[in-house]
Amino acid sequence: MTPTPVPPATTPTPVHRRVEMVMGLPISLALRGPHATGVRADAAWAEVLAVLREVDRVFSRYRPDTFISRLGRGEIGVDDCPREVAEVLALGEEARRASGGAFDVRRPGVPLDTDGVVKGWAVQRAAHALATLEDTDLCLSGGGD
């Protein structure tokens, strides 16, 4: 019987992590590969944060000046909001139908609440900024509830 050669041990590629609070959530990014550090990674992370901060500016229920807060109070209509508001409300309607009404962003007697759909939508949208990091593994996460 001939022994099977064992390949030499390789050093695992390090994972580089970044975390910042945005939208009241810890937003974390883990990168591994040739573009995990450096100018490109820094620029991509900055773009991720810019996208999420803009989402917070439009959708935060905790700030009275946001479009979603003003819409919920009836001060403005959907047509007065950025187009992303209609997109997120449509996702909320899809979730309401799919859940048989158990999930509803427009529950009677409760302020308009898109949080259940907007967080995932926002992280997915922000992830597009990471497309420039070819051959680099990544994990973008928006923690919280």
Annotate each PLM feature:
Residues 1-139:
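A contiguous, well-ordered beta/alpha segment that forms the leading edge of an enzyme domain
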Residues 140-145:
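FAD-binding core of FAD-dependent oxidoreductases
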